[in-house]
Every structure is written in C-alpha cells, then in structure tokens.
C-alpha cells in the first residue's frame, strides 16, 4: 500500500491541508470570500438604489412632460379663444363703423336732396316772380301795376317756399 503513488498523493494532500490549517490559510480564504461577498452585496445594493432613482426620475420626467403638454394645450386653446374674441370684436366694430358710415351717408344724401328741392323751389319761385312781373308790367301800368306786382310777388314767394 505504501508502494502505490495514490497513497503518497493522499498523504501529501493531508499533510498540506494540516499545514494550511495550522497556519490559518482557511481563515484568510474565508475572510477574502466574506469581503468579496460584502463588496458584491454593496454593488447590488447600489445598483438597486440607482435603478430606483432612475425609475423615480423617469416617472418625474413623464409627469413633467404630461404637465407641459397640458399647459401647451391650454395655451393653444386660450390663444384660439382670444383670437376668436378679437375677430368677433373686430367684426362688430367693422359692422358698427359701416352702419355709422351708412347712416351718415344717408343723412348727407337726405340733406343734399332737401337742399336740391329747396334750390329747385327757389329757382321756380324766382322764375314765377319774373314771369308774373313781366306779365303784370305789360298788362297793367301805373301805381296799380306796382301794387299788384308787389302783392303777386309776395304771394308767389310765400306759396312756393
């Protein structure tokens, strides 16, 4: 049995393990493994924390984006309403302006028409007075003619004006 190499390998292995146990290599290996385990645990905790922070930041970004989108829609709606109000106000002002200008033009036309009628009547009265004067002066002579002429002229003027 001592002549077999496997036996010597087993004895050497047991002696080596005994020396390692005596020197305390197992404690060094275990403490190194414990440190590595703690470092990996810390890295995993950091990764979880970073993941949670990223999720919070993403949720915050999405909320701010939605808020900005709503605010933009509100601004657009308010701008449309303001534009419609301004357009309606401008239309009302334009209609009021056109109505006032039309009324003013109609007033000027009526005034011009009344003035034209008055001018025509005055011209007709002057023509009638001239015709009456001519007829009376040709047919009647003297003081009677002058009295009739003044009376006729005043009657014609009062009736035509």
UniProtKB/Swiss-Prot annotation:
Ubl conjugation as UniProt keyword: no
Primary location class: membrane
GO cellular component, one term: plasma membrane
Ranges that cross the membrane: 5-25
Keywords on record: ATP synthesis, Cell inner membrane, Cell membrane, CF(0), Hydrogen ion transport, Ion transport, Membrane, Transmembrane, Transmembrane helix, Transport
Pfam families xrefs: ATP-synt_B
Secretion signal span: none
GO MF, one example: proton-transporting ATP synthase activity, rotational mechanism
Membrane topology according to the record: Single-pass membrane protein
Location in or out of the cell: Cell inner membrane
PANTHER family: ATP SYNTHASE SUBUNIT B (PTHR33445:SF1), ATP SYNTHASE SUBUNIT B', CHLOROPLASTIC (PTHR33445)
Function of the molecule: F(1)F(0) ATP synthase produces ATP from ADP in the presence of a proton or sodium gradient. F-type ATPases consist of two structural domains, F(1) containing the extramembraneous catalytic core and F(0) containing the membrane proton channel, linked together by a central stalk and a peripheral stalk. During catalysis, ATP synthesis in the catalytic domain of F(1) is coupled via a rotary mechanism of the central stalk subunits to proton translocation. Component of the F(0) channel, it forms part of the peripheral stalk, linking F(1) to F(0).
HAMAP family from the UniProt entry: ATP_synth_b_bprime
Complex and partners: F-type ATPases have 2 components, F(1) - the catalytic core - and F(0) - the membrane proton channel. F(1) has five subunits: alpha(3), beta(3), gamma(1), delta(1), epsilon(1). F(0) has three main subunits: a(1), b(2) and c(10-14). The alpha and beta chains form an alternating ring which encloses part of the gamma chain. F(1) is attached to F(0) by a central stalk formed by the gamma and epsilon chains, while a peripheral stalk is formed by the delta and b chains.
Record-stated family: Belongs to the ATPase B chain family.
The name this protein goes by in its record: ATP synthase subunit b 1
Species for this entry: Nitrobacter winogradskyi (strain ATCC 25391 / DSM 10237 / CIP 104748 / NCIMB 11846 / Nb-255)
């Amino acid at each position: 049995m001592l002549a077999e190499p496997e036996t010597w390998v087993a004895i050497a292995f047991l002696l080596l393990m005994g020396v390692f146990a005596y020197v305390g290599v197992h404690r060094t290996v275990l403490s190194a493994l414990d440190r590595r385990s703690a470092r990996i645990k810390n890295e995993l905790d950091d990764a979880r924390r970073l993941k949670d922070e990223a999720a919070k930041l993403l949720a915050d970004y999405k909320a701010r984006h939605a808020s900005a989108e709503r605010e933009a829609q509100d601004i657009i709606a308010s701008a449309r309403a303001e534009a419609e109000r301004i357009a309606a106000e401008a239309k009302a002002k334009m209609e009021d302006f056109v109505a006032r200008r039309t009324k003013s033009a109609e007033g000027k036309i009526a005034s011009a028409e009344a003035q034209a009628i008055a001018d025509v009547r005055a011209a007709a009265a002057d023509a009638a007075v001239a015709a009456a004067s001519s007829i009376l002066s040709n047919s009647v002579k003297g003081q009677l003619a002058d009295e009739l002429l003044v009376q006729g002229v005043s009657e014609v003027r009062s009736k035509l004006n």
